[in-house]
Amino acid sequence: VRRFEHLTVVTNSIQNALVLSERPEFTVILIGGILDKKELSLGNDFSQMLESLHLDILFMSVSGVHPSVGLTDQGPSEARVQKQMCQIADRTVVLADSSKFGRASLVKLCALCDVDQIITDGGLDTDMEQKIKDTGVTLDVVRNGER
């Protein structure tokens, strides 16, 4: 995020909005809805607002990354937002630490081949890494000390 001089960010995460609001050159669009106190995010039916937007790149996190099930998340409300944002984005990048791999949560978001890139840490075993790559998605593993 530091390399961008001007950036418009669309989020339903209050925490992300607060962090990004510290950058005066960024525009933050916080999508409204019902507050999920546990996740500190807003969820509800705000699909009309999302339908009017275009996203160049969507960065999203998930609860599970499974080679055959795909990308999953715990909350139906959050999953609905993620699915719609994937549809309006030119490019989707998933950020998931290695503990999320091989897991499938409650709500299926999409197949792995439906996203452009997955970025994870160096804790992924080589067998799982190969299974993910076999789905056709670009997998980038960031090892300790790499940027």
What is each model feature region?
Residues 8, 15-147:
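Conserved phosphate- and dinucleotide-binding cores of soluble alpha/beta proteins
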Residues 1-5, 10:
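Glycine-rich beta-alpha loop segments
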